[in-house]
């Protein structure tokens, strides 16, 4: 167990609490989607317990939406609407190999089953009425419509945001100076909060390195904090040209800003920092970013590594508030094409990107530090 000061521990716990309050509306969004897709009815028709694949078949949603359904059900199980049980003979059909989680109705979700199918009076009409604002609000970004949408062969994997608005969040930021400023200010505030704790409690992760490149580092909040703490460290911030154009002109002497694209190339350095970046991208996109990072750093023996600051879902499964916050934030990210990953999901993309070893340190509350080695 890593020991940190009581002040830092309280700040990290307060961060989780605020994040939970901020994104708790995603539980209502998940419930609205469950009602729209008639998930409780689907499980009821399977005898009260069903795997994801079985639910998918019952509700008539395409198999490519299975990961999205998993994320909806993860929120609804953590919040207690459904529960996960051991596979039974009924659920271990030819459709399942016994490794899929099996979702069971609880007393709460049994009240979502339609009255025609259940002896218990259904509350679905009442909840449909109460939750209707979430269907029409940008807060949900048309998640139900996304589940029902047939994938376009010309644009596979389109996220709910793009389906609703016809563009990506990043393109909106590029075109709209006000939204770009709002986003950059939000990321800078997060960096100021997190780096204060990181450099106070865990500064050793930056010891013994000569150069660092902060990939998609925005206006440089994290990098400038690191550079101030380590004046001999040569630091580079890489981001898109329209982002670095808004960087402060009076930056610290050992920090430079470079306009570029992480999907094309990354400036060379001993260490690459990816703070809260990879969760915005699909597995394939993360693998491409990580391969470019690998080309930018030396071997492990020569001090090369990647420092990732991101969520590892289930990093402390004993903390129910933390876990709930991680999964409801993951559902929020799903709307823009992002994803929060558990350790096995992280490991998969690390190996596919050609890395040999990694170390996860769940020491930043909601997020963890991951050191990744070539």
UniProtKB/Swiss-Prot annotation:
GO molecular function: 5-n-alk(en)ylresorcinol O-methyltransferase activity; O-methyltransferase activity; protein dimerization activity; S-adenosylmethionine-dependent methyltransferase activity
Keywords: Methyltransferase, S-adenosyl-L-methionine, Transferase
GO biological process annotation, one example: biosynthetic process
Record EC number: 2.1.1.n7
Tissue expr: Expressed predominantly in root hairs.
First-tier enzyme category under EC: transferase
Name of the molecule in the record: 5-pentadecatrienyl resorcinol O-methyltransferase
Species of the source: Sorghum bicolor (Sorghum)
